[in-house]
Structure formats: C-alpha cells, structure tokens
C-alpha cells in the first residue's frame, strides 16, 4: 500500500510538533523510535533543510509527515509555500517570532494560499524562549498571543490551525477560542504539562463544555478535550522529549477522567483524520 494513501491503517500516535535539527542521524533515530511506537510525526522543516528532508520523506512516508517551516516575514514565503506543497508536504509551521502580530493584513495572502492548498498550519502561541539573551532581536511574545488567531480563523474558515503550547500562559483564551472555532486545535507541548503536574485537574476548568446544552455554546460538540492534539516539541535533537511528553499527556488525561475514545483522538486520531481529509481532497496526493 502507498504509505501516503489516506486509507491506510491509522497510527496509534501522531506527534504534530517535531523540529528537525538538520542532522540526518537524528532523522534515522526519530524514524526508529516512531516505528517502535506505531507513531507518525509532523517534521518541521526549514528551507535550508528542504532538499535533505524531501529525500528522506520519500523513503519514510510511513512515519514522517512534512511541514514547511516558513518564516512569515520571508520575502520569498509564498514561493516556499508552493515548493513545500509541490514536494508533498502536508502542512506549514511552526510560524513564530514574526515582525508583526499574527493577524496583521500583510500575512493574509500567505494564510489564504495555505487555505487554498488545504495545508495544515502550526502557530507558536504565547511566551517564546530567549536562547541568546545577549543578542538583540526583534521578537515579542505579544505578537504571538493566541488571541491573534481569532481574526485569522474567522477570515479563513477553511484553514486548519494548531495553536502550539495552548497559548501559554493564556490557556483560558486558547480553550475558549477552540470552543467557537471548529478549525482550531491546541497542542500542549512545552512547559505547560510540567508546571501543572501537581494538579492536572485544572484542565477540566479550561475544557468545561463537554455535554453542555446552551445557546451560549456550539451545538453537537464532542468531549471538549477533543480539541487537543498530541505534540512533543522535540528540538535540538532531544528525542527523549517524545517519551516524556507521552507520559505527561497520558497522566493528565487520566487525572482528568478523559474517556478512551477521546484519548485515542488526542493521541493520534484527530491529527490523522485531518491529514487524511487533506490528502483525500488532493486526490490522494499532498
């Protein structure tokens, strides 16, 4: 069977957030770990990594899903979106560290093209790290707030968006935006499941609307936790974060009493459905 066939057996796990560090040995180790876990991963690939990853994806499409890590402020961003699409990548991102707020009109043509191509998008939301504090940088976490996605989600209803880090620390806003925007999903990678480990029950207050019947909440929604998709945010080749993230997610879902069907959706089912729908709409191709 063609490994890119959207009708193939779904993997148990889909990690929507793995950064490539440029090292082909990392790719080999990642593939081995994913296959052992019956998992797939969305591999965030920068333009300089394009040729290397494109070749690798062709050989390992059973466990790797390409995401083009395009810079929103790159003058050549639209061309890179086309190149990633033509090469069989299924998504874009992680969009981050932009010179303007995410919802600035200058980025509209990029989001419009992504929606036309049905490319899944991953946005960094919330606080952003500062690895070199002595180096000046035009970066502001305020431009990356999860609330900046609201206008994008409404303007481009066909654009599937994953908000990485669930807006850390704006969790209430992130959950409420996901409640009203069917094209928004949330990932809990990063520090969130570390700092909340003493009482994961707090997530029940964020995802409060399961089974609620009210004119003040959308009708027909499944378990509110179904807005989550699994993510590890592996970067700098730190593959151990995959297993640590799995354990944190499973523990949180257990503490919150999330049912088995919803857990399966979070850990892989939802992401695989989105990818399969995207491929089916493209005639079985990326």
Give the location of each predicted region.
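Acidic (Asp/Glu)-rich catalytic clusters
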Residues: 5-9, 29-36, 51-65, 79-88, ...
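Charged helix-capping and loop-helix junction motifs
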Residues: 103-112, 138-147, 200-213, 245
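Active-site gating/metal-coordination segments in enzymes
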Residues: 48-143, 192-193
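Hydrophobic faces of well-ordered beta-strands that scaffold small-molecule active sites
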Residues: 14-18, 41-43, 65-68, 92-94, ...
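Conserved, mostly hydrophobic/aromatic
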Residues: 17, 34, 84, 92, ...
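Histidine/acidic-residue-rich catalytic or RNA/ligand-binding cores of hydrolases
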Residues: 24-28, 53, 131-135, 171-180, ...
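Mid-to-C-terminal alpha-helical segments outside catalytic/metal-binding sites
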Residues: 1-17, 25-40, 51, 82, ...
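His/Asp/Glu-enriched short active-site or ligand-binding loop at hydrolase and phosphoryl-transfer sites
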Residues: 185-199
